[in-house]
Every structure is written in C-alpha cells, then in structure tokens.
C-alpha cells in the first residue's frame, strides 16, 4: 500500500527509463516526490488556486434526475467561483522521438522478475485527431497488427530451437505522450542474452516480410469478435460507466459515441481495413530506431544480463543476419468431427436444486442446465464435464492438472486456442 515493495520499486525505475527525456520521468503519479514529501501549507494553497479553477473543471451528472432542477443547482453553486486571472497554461509534455535504440536495466534486491522487453514508440494522436473516425480506424489497425504478431510469436514459441520460453505482446500508451507496442520475452534458464537475440530475430522477420493475407484475415476476425463483445458491454453501461466516458471526453477529448454509432463506425472501419494498410504499420511498430531494450533482473542473475554494448551489438547483428521468410501455414484446420455423429435423445427431464434442470441423455450422461441472472457486461456460457468412478494414484493428480492446462493451451485436434 505504501508502494515500497519490489514490484513498485521496479515499476518506478522502469518508468524513469520509459519516460526518459520527458518531465514525467522525474514525477510520480501525484507529482515530484521531493515536493510531495516536503511541501508547506502555502505551497498546497498555491497549487489549489493554480489548477483547481473553473476553466479546468467540469460537473458530470448521470442518473434518473430532474435535469432542469439539477442544472439550476449546479449553476447556483458553481457560478459564484471567480474566473482565474492570468491562468497558468496547462502544458502537454512529450517523450522525444529517438533515431537510435536505447537500453535500460532495472533490478532490486528483493525482485524475482527476469524478463527482456522491447518497447517501440509511436505518435499519440493529437486532441483533434482523437475526435475523428480516422482515430478509430488507426486503433483497429493496431489491434489487428497485434493479433498477427501474437499468432506469429506463439508459433515461434513452439519451435524446438526457440530461444525464449514465451513472448507477451501488448499495446499501450505512456500518458498522452506516445503509443507503445511492447514485447516481453521470458527467458529460458534466466538467459536474457538468448531471449533478447531470439525476440529481436522474430521481430526482424516481421519487419522484413510482414504478414500474409491469411494471417490478416484470421487476425481481423479475432479482433471483430473481441470488438463485438466489447460493444455488448458498452451497450450495457451503468451510470458509473457513462460518467467515466464523459470524464474521458473532458480530460482527453475522447468523444462520447452512442452504442449504435459506435457499432456502425467500428464495423465499417474494420471491414475497410486491408492487409497492405496494416502491414504498413511495420515501420513504426518494429523499427529498431528509437526502440527501448529494457531488461528486468534479480541481482542473483545479473551475470546473465546483456550489457548495453552487447544489446546494441545484437541489434546490429540481427539487422545484418540472413533471416528466412516465415513458413506459411498449409490448409486451414478442418472440422472437429470428420465422421457423422449420431445424435442421441433426452430420455428424462427433472427439476434439480438451485433452479437447474437435469437432463438424462440416451447414453447415460446427465446434463445439469441452469440459467443465471445476467451480469452487466458479461455474456457467456460455462461448461464443465465431470466423470466419476475409476481409481487414480496420488502421483497421477499432478499430471491430470497439467493435462488440463496443456489442452487449454494447445487447443483441440487441428484447432488452436485462437
């Protein structure tokens, strides 16, 4: 809670590197900690009058209220606050765009975290750009690019010669300074040099050759499913959700869009995206120029951390290396069942506890079906299969749990988890 554990200390050290060159690199969430830890009464009063002023405030009311009466109350209370004289300008700070890669190492005596991150910086849309349909299209294109990269890296993990255990790819942003594309490689045997070499090579392959149309279509379909689920949640907004959207509009100029308009805009822009357009993002999403290599390590494994010089040498060698084109997948996965399935019948139905129904099938399987009240923003069907009987040794239990995770990760038959 005091932010003095290993994770918090590592996060602060990482932020100093990620935001380097910006005022944010010297500030915590609530400001310059030297001032926070030592300010006097007058400093606090001056800060209040400098920033807590009418032109930087908004009152947002959401609920079943008398609109006219509520507006009168707000005007009565707020209109007496005087306008600030010679108001301070609200500055927007940036992170400088570099033309060379950067390196950072963060560690802590108590941390167990061992990882290698590649962070690629892209421009953050301006206030004017955020209010356009183009901003929606750009964000959708980034999401499709992300899904293609995730699928490609997931395939790379499975290779016998993979040089890392796993790579996690995410999109993000640093305040309103920069958008980011971040890859976190988890090393084998704490070997961060090998992990860095491996992820650099896989990213360079993407940068050189891009993605195929088949990869694009699969990723776009996945983004479409994700957006559909998000739109259903958007449509089921609570008052708190609505208030949050209006706050985003006021503080970040993110326009509030009705559910119908949002559904239409997302659908139109996603349908209009092309493989060539998304492949065109490679320059900003995978270029080593301006890339940050950020290594997190426990102190006991510092001998396996690449130095700054070693990291830059690896970047240069990968840029010059011969890298084969990615292997294209063969035919798409076929149906789950290749033989005709003979349907059974429900031979008995009865009421079960907790409002459920019990169906006995002709093959003896019992199905318990229960409909639960809808939770706002959550629409899903949960299925659990249980087979009773038989014997298992204690030593088998661990393997059974491992098998569950294996199936969940690898998929079924020719169908992967995507």
Task: Name each model-derived stretch.
Residues 1, 66, 85-99, 162-171, ...:
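Acidic/histidine-enriched alpha-helical segments
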Residues 1, 29-37, 56-64, 130-138, ...:
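Second-shell loop/turn segments in exported
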Residues 1-47, 96, 102, 140, ...:
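Acidic/histidine-enriched segments that form metal/cofactor-coordinating
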Residues 38-47, 162-170, 276-279, 418:
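Short amphipathic beta-strand starts and helix->beta connectors
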Residues 45-161, 196-200, 297-418:
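His/Glu-rich zincin catalytic helix
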Residues 119, 146-186, 245:
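A structural supersecondary motif
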Residues 156, 173-232, 254-255, 268-272, ...:
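M16/insulysin-pitrilysin zinc metalloprotease superfamily fold
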Residues 271-304:
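Extended, domain-scale alpha-helical bundle/helix-rich regions
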């Amino acid at each position: 809670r005091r932010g003095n554990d290993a994770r918090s200390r590592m996060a602060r050290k990482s932020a100093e590197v990620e935001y380097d060159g910006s005022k944010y690199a010297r500030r915590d969430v609530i400001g310059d900690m030297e001032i926070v830890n030592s300010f006097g009464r007058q400093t606090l009063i001056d800060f209040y009058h400098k920033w807590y002023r009418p032109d930087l405030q908004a009152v947002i009311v959401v609920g079943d209220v008398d609109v006219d009466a509520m507006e009168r109350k707000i005007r009565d209370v707020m209109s007496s606050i005087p306008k600030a004289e010679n108001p301070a300008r609200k500055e927007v700070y940036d992170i400088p765009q570099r033309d060379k890669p950067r390196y950072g190492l963060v560690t802590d005596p108590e941390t167990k975290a061992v990882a290698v991150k590649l962070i690629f910086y892209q421009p953050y849309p301006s206030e004017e750009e955020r209010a356009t349909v183009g901003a929606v299209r750009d964000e959708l294109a980034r999401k499709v690019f992300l899904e293609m990269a995730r699928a490609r890296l997931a395939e790379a993990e499975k290779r016998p010669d993979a040089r890392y255990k796993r790579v996690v790819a995410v999109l993000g942003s640093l305040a309103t300074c920069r958008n980011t594309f971040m890859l976190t490689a988890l090393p084998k045997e704490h070997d961060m040099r090998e992990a860095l070499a491996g992820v650099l090579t896989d990213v360079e392959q993407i940068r050189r050759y891009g993605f195929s149309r088949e990869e694009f279509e699969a990723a776009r379909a996945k983004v479409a499913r994700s957006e559909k689920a998000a739109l259903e949640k958007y449509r089921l907004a609570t008052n708190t959700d609505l208030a949050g959207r209006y706050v985003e509009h006021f503080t970040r100029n993110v326009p509030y869009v009705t559910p119908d308009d949002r559904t239409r805009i997302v659908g139109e822009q996603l349908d209009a995206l092309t493989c060539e357009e998304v492949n065109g993002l490679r320059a900003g999403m995978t270029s080593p120029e301006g890339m940050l290599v950020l290594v997190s390590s426990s102190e006991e494994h510092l001998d396996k951390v690449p130095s700054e010089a070693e990291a830059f040498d690896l970047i240069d060698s990968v840029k010059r290396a011969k890298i084969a084109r990615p292997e294209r997948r063969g035919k798409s996965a076929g149906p789950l069942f290749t033989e005709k399935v003979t349907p059974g019948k429900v031979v008995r139905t009865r009421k079960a506890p907790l409002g459920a129904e019990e169906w006995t099938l002709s093959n003896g399987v019992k199905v318990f079906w229960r409909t639960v009240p809808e939770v706002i923003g959550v629409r899903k069907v949960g299925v659990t299969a249980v087979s009773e009987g038989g014997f298992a040794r204690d030593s088998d239990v661990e393997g059974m749990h491992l098998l569950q995770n294996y199936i969940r990760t690898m998929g079924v038959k020719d169908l992967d988890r995507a």
